[in-house]
């Protein structure tokens, strides 16, 4: 019997493989992206302290868009996380796409964060 491939399980395996190589430091923390069917989340994490420094998502009060699962929403989250990071003095990050393909909402978030001033 042929079993159907569980895309999320494959993504988690890919993310584990990527996380072995990507590590966020205090000088250059990790920008982690999580994408669900309805929302998108971004965190800037210092892996040496195991602490989230800055976060933004489509659930935030400052978000202000009606639709939360499209490219425009991802761009807004990218701008929010970059603005908050720059307020904390973070300019350079390591991008962690979370095992997702660099396409669509993930790419839109990354491009918006770059345009807002983050370097990666």
Curated annotation (Swiss-Prot):
One of the Pfam families matching this protein, by short name: Ribosomal_L18p
Post-translation changes: The protein, when overexpressed in E.coli, contains a phosphoserine, which is required for the protein to bind to 5S rRNA. It has been suggested, based solely on amino acid conservation, that this occurs on Ser-57.
GO BP annotation list: translation
CC annotations in GO: cytosolic large ribosomal subunit
Keyword rRNA-binding: yes
Alphabetized GO MF terms: 5S rRNA binding; structural constituent of ribosome
CDD domains reported for this sequence: Ribosomal_L18_L5e
Function: This is one of the proteins that bind and probably mediate the attachment of the 5S RNA into the large ribosomal subunit, where it forms part of the central protuberance.
Quaternary structure (record): Part of the 50S ribosomal subunit; part of the 5S rRNA/L5/L18 subcomplex. In B.stearothermophilus only 2 proteins, L5 and L18 have been shown to be part of this subcomplex, unlike the case in E.coli and T.thermophilus where L25 (TL5) is also found.
Protein's recorded name: Large ribosomal subunit protein uL18
Protein's organism: Geobacillus stearothermophilus (Bacillus stearothermophilus)
